[in-house]
Amino acid sequence: MAQTLAQTKQISQSHTFDVSQSHHKTPNDTNSHSVIYSTQNLDLWYGENHALQNINLDIYENQITAIIGPSGCGKSTYIKTLNRMVELVPTVKTAGKILYRDQDIFDQKYSKEQLRTNVGMVFQQPNPFPKSIYDNITYGPKIHGIKNKKVLDEIVEKSLRGAAIWDELKDRLHTNAYSLSGGQQQRVCIARCLAIEPEVILMDEPTSALDPISTLRVEELVQELKEKYTIIMVTHNMQQAARVSDKTAFFLNGYVNEYDDTDKIFSNPSNKKTEDYISGRFG
């Protein structure tokens, strides 16, 4: 099955980065991980509002990167540039580059559809389709041309197992996804994302609408997923960022104020504003 879906992808997986030549903000212990995203001198405007300013940020493969900062600082805007969803806003304009596996995603020849196959997204509010669980999971693979029932069945099981919810739902696959709890719906949305075999998963506050038990399950799942995927997660929850992430970027007023290993950010930040934010003095 993996080969069948992989054949529908046209973005080359062979590009690599020479990390030693990076001139961007990088954490210290990155020797064992390749750069998958390199944001270079990125500026973004909503009309006249300069929402992102001179963003330089390298994201490392098979790591969890937390994006933190107060409301309106540019966190969600930034991750939506990574799969170009931000372009759904008519007044948006950008300058600078975002390299995904050494290709500029803003290049006119670069396919947004291909990018969004490789870079999945999970939103703040669970947003399953008004369809059965089975149809939710198979939606993406069907768009990519997979019609074989056996292959689709395998994708459903693999994806739900990947989202740690197969045992809960295996006897309810043809139930409407709206009938599930909020935590179950969010894990179905994660499974739907996994079904198209992305390399990167963007998460925009994926647990903010969930109860504590569901939040814990999603956090445990995120830790497991980084073995196969690169995860970039926006969160307002400082404890969550400290628990689950490897790297943390602190955004403030549209800038990257500090970016480092999560342990360093939360134990000995280099910037006073970072310290003030994570200690709750503002935000």
Swiss-Prot record:
SMART domains: AAA. Residues 1-33 are annotated as: Disordered. Belongs to the ABC transporter superfamily. Phosphate importer (TC 3.A.1.7) family. It is a peripheral membrane protein. GO terms for biological process: phosphate ion transmembrane transport. It catalyses: phosphate(out) + ATP + H2O = ADP + 2 phosphate(in) + H(+). The keyword Cell membrane applies. Its EC number is 7.3.2.1. One of its GO terms (cellular component) is plasma membrane. PROSITE patterns: ABC_TRANSPORTER_1, ABC_TRANSPORTER_2, PSTB. InterPro entries: AAA+_ATPase, ABC_transporter-like_ATP-bd, ABC_transporter-like_CS, P-loop_NTPase, PstB-like. Part of the ABC transporter complex PstSACB involved in phosphate import. Responsible for energy coupling to the transport system. This is Phosphate import ATP-binding protein PstB. Residues 1-20 have a biased composition (Polar residues). Signal peptide: none annotated.
